[in-house]
Amino acid sequence: MTNYFNSLSLRDQLAQLGTCRFMELDEFSNEVAVLKDKKIVIVGCGAQGLNQGLNMRDSGLDISYALREGAIKEKRQSWKNATENNFNVGTYEELIPKADLVINLTPDKQHTSVIKAIQPHIKKDAVLSYSHGFNIVEEGTKIREDITVIMVAPKCPGTEVREEYKRGFGVPTLIAVHPENDPHGIGLDWAKAYAYATGGHRAGVLESSFVAEVKSDLMGEQTMLCGVLQTGSILTFDKMVADGVEPNYAAKLIQYGWETITEALKHGGITNMMDRLSNPAKLRANEIAEELKEKMRPLFQKHMDDIISGEFSSRMMRDWANDDKELLTWRAETENTAFEKTEATSEEIKEQEYFDKGVLMVAFVRAGVELAFETMVEAGIIEESAYYESLHETPLIANTIARKKLYEMNRVISDTAEYGCYLFDHAAKPLVKDYVNSLEPEVAGKKFGTDCNGVDNQKLIHVNDDLRSHPVEKVGARLRTAMTAMKKIYA
């Protein structure tokens, strides 16, 4: 496949994959100064477009929305999103020629046509920004030489960009400057100010590259962030019901359980999440996680290989050209699963109960996080970037499941993420279904270890040491020290 990444030499590919630097808070001391009094035009007003714009306006910036003429005339949802929040709205021709910063926040599938439409209207020496580098890296789009091209990529769905900002926090963010388009050397300063305006500096900002962002983002969302949560939801629900758990209770345990379980992950990593289990349950979750890792590792490696080579992007773009046949088929299959169609009980479930009766879910999270992290690092992605794409974003995705199950998760993630999630889930379920069904009923929906709380001390010590010594735990402990304003999701 011919694209920007594949046009690079191997040395340059590795260099860009390995670009990742955690930025210190004092690097954002200028706050939004370089963007003050600048005309900022966001193209598209979906989940990312609206919520980033709301944060930036609250940070004192001048935000307008450029939409297709048809979207304005027909008063489509993007027009409603912008006008109902009192933003100035206009066509490409009306707003983009005046813009100092143009931010393309349309769906990935539309980027090529959108850039073709707006680039002639972008004034000389302006700045163009993306929140995902797919169009540059995978499609190979070339931008006019006088235009500075940057990326500010919040590592979560757009809805959570806003929710975390309103909590007084933010979401981890990757920023980058396209090396082919920084004619005046201003890209990094503009990207820093933009990240500050969305609140990203409070959660941690990585100076990355377009290549590293795209390859790690695709891997994280396909495997742990969306794929494992979808596969785990469907298989765990089916197992619980087969084992006699009341379906409405099972639905609630899963729908809200991911959010609760990964809240512990967010604040203290895998170690803290596993520590919420009883000692017997911890040992059993460890055994299940190790077995899941062994069974799923080849699939994780295939996804990473296909992402690096461009095979994944080629397949997805073929589906785009085929009117999203695969995506729509998989979406319909997901909507018709028993988990999606079963209403959650109104019965209260206490926080600790989600852990006590969710040993299998904890094991899925541990296996998915560690596998995604390990596979990305093996491919040359720096540990800090792999951490954000495997562990830290997981509770933010889990929060979307808590709202409206898998439907909500797949609705608010990007179109590339949704396709990748279904692709992974379609292959993962047959890999682990029989193993999951063979597990004892106590690992899902019933409290584990009620007969005996005794464990082998040496075995417990060994498991605890293994958990704490995993590289994702070490890098996570370091990065979380910067997240001093981190807020609870689960209340």
Curated annotation (Swiss-Prot):
KW Cell membrane (keyword) present: no
Binding annotation for Mg(2+) 2: D217, E389, E393
KARI C-terminal knotted domain segment(s): 209-353, 354-486
All copies of domain KARI N-terminal Rossmann, residue ranges: 15-208
Binding sites annotated in the UniProt record for Mg(2+) 1: D217, E221
Protein name: Ketol-acid reductoisomerase (NADP(+))
Cofactor: Mg(2+)
Entry keywords, A to Z: Amino-acid biosynthesis, Branched-chain amino acid biosynthesis, Magnesium, Metal-binding, NADP, Oxidoreductase, Repeat
Organism: Christiangramia forsetii (strain DSM 17595 / CGMCC 1.15422 / KT0803)
List of residues binding substrate: S414
One Gene Ontology term, aspect cellular component: cytosol
Cofactor note: Binds 2 magnesium ions per subunit.
Stored Gene3D superfamilies: N-(1-d-carboxylethyl)-l-norvaline Dehydrogenase, domain 2, NAD(P)-binding Rossmann-like Domain
Gene Ontology molecular function: any one: ketol-acid reductoisomerase activity
Coiled coil: none
A Pfam family: KARI_N
GO process annotations (BP): isoleucine biosynthetic process; L-valine biosynthetic process
Pathway per the UniProt entry: Amino-acid biosynthesis; L-isoleucine biosynthesis; L-isoleucine from 2-oxobutanoate: step 2/4; Amino-acid biosynthesis; L-valine biosynthesis; L-valine from pyruvate: step 2/4
Protein's job: Involved in the biosynthesis of branched-chain amino acids (BCAA). Catalyzes an alkyl-migration followed by a ketol-acid reduction of (S)-2-acetolactate (S2AL) to yield (R)-2,3-dihydroxy-isovalerate. In the isomerase reaction, S2AL is rearranged via a Mg-dependent methyl migration to produce 3-hydroxy-3-methyl-2-ketobutyrate (HMKB). In the reductase reaction, this 2-ketoacid undergoes a metal-dependent reduction by NADPH to yield (R)-2,3-dihydroxy-isovalerate.
UniProt: NADP(+) binding residues: C45, G46, A47, Q48, R68, R76, S78, D108, K109, Q110, G158
Catalytic activity: (2R)-2,3-dihydroxy-3-methylbutanoate + NADP(+) = (2S)-2-acetolactate + NADPH + H(+); (2R,3R)-2,3-dihydroxy-3-methylpentanoate + NADP(+) = (S)-2-ethyl-2-hydroxy-3-oxobutanoate + NADPH + H(+)
Lineage: Bacteria, Pseudomonadati, Bacteroidota, Flavobacteriia, Flavobacteriales
Residues spanning the membrane: none
Family statement: Belongs to the ketol-acid reductoisomerase family.
